[in-house]
């Protein structure tokens, strides 16, 4: 599939030049940093960061999946609920069940283990997949290219857009814009394992006002190659091996 025709322009921050979509006025949105509370999530974050433990790709993928499961549970609190009568062997029970029609949107390839964790909990959700990758112009200059999209209609649904690393925010932004070609969701939640503060600031000015952002951790800076510091490295390579 040909690359999506999404408007981009040159963007520079901290001495790094990117290509990004046009800026808007910053706005308020709900941002949840799960690492602000001490939970078992901290163990899984520590292991995916650890240079010795992360070499075990099977364990790395499983830890990302576990983080996805925990985040899915937390994000389920943002959904709308309705009362449903359930017949038991001994009578009728009234349960509150999610009323939202959820679509799990994932950015390939690094997002697959995180997607699996979310899908373990949102097992009735439809799924959307977007390919977004960095096309380098020089060592410190790149554009994000979106070349593939498979998605159901999104009108009136709740979109959970998951990506393990929110470094610059550009991939998530362009992936979201690609998904909008399939309709406008009623609610959007952006979920990541680790975000940079720069990416959070970027999302504030590029996503709709009512977007909710969930992060397992937020790190302070990007390095000269636009990788999160301290971060964990390249999540896609750690999951699936180095790419050429």
How does the language model describe each region?
Residues 4-7, 16-18, 22-244:
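PRPP-associated nucleotide enzymes
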């Amino acid at each position: 599939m040909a690359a999506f025709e999404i408007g981009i322009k040159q963007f520079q921050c901290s001495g790094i030049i990117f290509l990004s979509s046009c800026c808007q006025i910053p706005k308020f949105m709900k941002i949840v940093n799960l690492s602000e509370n001490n939970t078992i999530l901290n163990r899984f974050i520590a292991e995916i960061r650890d240079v010795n433990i992360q070499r075990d790709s099977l364990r790395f993928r499983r830890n990302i999946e576990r983080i996805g499961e925990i985040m899915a549970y937390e994000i389920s609190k943002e959904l709308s609920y309705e009362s449903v009568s359930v017949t038991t062997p001994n009578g009728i029970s009234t349960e509150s069940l999610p009323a939202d029609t959820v679509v799990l949107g994932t950015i390939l390839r690094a997002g697959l283990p995180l997607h699996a964790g979310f899908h373990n909990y949102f097992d009735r959700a439809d799924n959307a997949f977007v390919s977004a990758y960095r096309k380098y112009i020089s060592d410190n200059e790149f554009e994000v290219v979106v070349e593939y999209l498979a998605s159901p209609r999104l009108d009136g649904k709740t979109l959970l857009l998951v990506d393990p690393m929110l470094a610059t925010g550009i991939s998530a932004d362009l992936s979201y814009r690609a998904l909008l070609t399939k309709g406008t969701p009623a609610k959007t939640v952006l979920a990541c394992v680790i975000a940079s503060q720069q990416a959070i600031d970027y999302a504030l000015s590029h996503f709709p006002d009512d977007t909710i952002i969930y992060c397992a951790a937020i790190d302070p800076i990007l390095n000269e190659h636009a990788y999160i510091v301290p971060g964990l490295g390249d999540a896609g390579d750690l999951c699936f091996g180095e790419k050429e």
